[in-house]
Amino acid sequence: MTNKEFSDGFSTLLNSFGITPNITLDEYEKSTFLTNAQEQLIIDIYSGRNIIYGKSFEQTEEIRRYLSNLVETYETSTKVTGKLGLSKDSVFFEIPQDTWFITYEVAFLKDSRLGCLDGIEASVVPLPQDDLYRAKDNPFRGPSKDRVLRLDIKSDLAELISKYNVDKYLMRYISQPTPIILVDLPDGLSINGVSTESECELNPVVHRAILERAVQLAIISKTQLTGNKE
């Protein structure tokens, strides 16, 4: 849908509920509800909690296509220094600030102790911080030539724990979507830091679901404020 189609569809669908008194929204309010609906739908699709789609992001090609426009790849060999890790083998890398969900990640190990395996790719395994003590010395769960552990400490920083030197970190991730902003917003107004018009970047097949959820959010919000029900 174009932004005009989103706006017109929002008004039409909202009016079809026959709510009294009628709910009237400006373009900023519509944009806010559409953006919130988009973000909720992405989380539901990724996790598999959405009852319409039923499966999570990695389970079917169809579901992966719904979010394919948000998939980004990031690679870095620049380590962040001056950070105190939970292990003597900790190393830190910055990750993009728009990272929502990491879907694939590997570390490239470059260490003379690896011999002919120098330069090998190791899977990066996310680990809750309270599991680190139990996992770090476990041969099946701890760091090895095939496995590097990752702890998340900030939204833009990853702590990797490896027995060997990590030369490079590669990840593929679902990025935070740009907000759906129907028109350029007046001075002082923004959504997720953006104030200029921007269209939905998701696969068009989910646009209708975003619109319907946005209208539901608007009805819930407005009826709670006025005390009216459908």
UniProtKB/Swiss-Prot annotation:
What broad class describes the main subcellular location of this protein? virion
| GO cellular component terms given for this protein | virion component
Write out the entry's keywords from A to Z.
Virion
Q: Say if the entry is tagged with keyword DNA-binding.
A: no
Record's subcellular location = Virion
Protein function: Forms the tail multi-ring barrel with ring protein 1, ring protein 2 and ring protein 4.
The record makes one more remark, namely: The barrel is composed of five stacked dodecameric ring structures. Podoviridae-like phages usually possess only one such ring. The tail is thus rather long.
Quaternary structure, per UniProt, is: Homododecamer.
**What's the protein called, per UniProt?**
Ring protein 3
Species in which this protein is naturally found: Bacteroides phage crAss001 (Bacteroides phage PhiCrAss001)
High-level lineage: Viruses, Duplodnaviria, Heunggongvirae, Uroviricota, Caudoviricetes
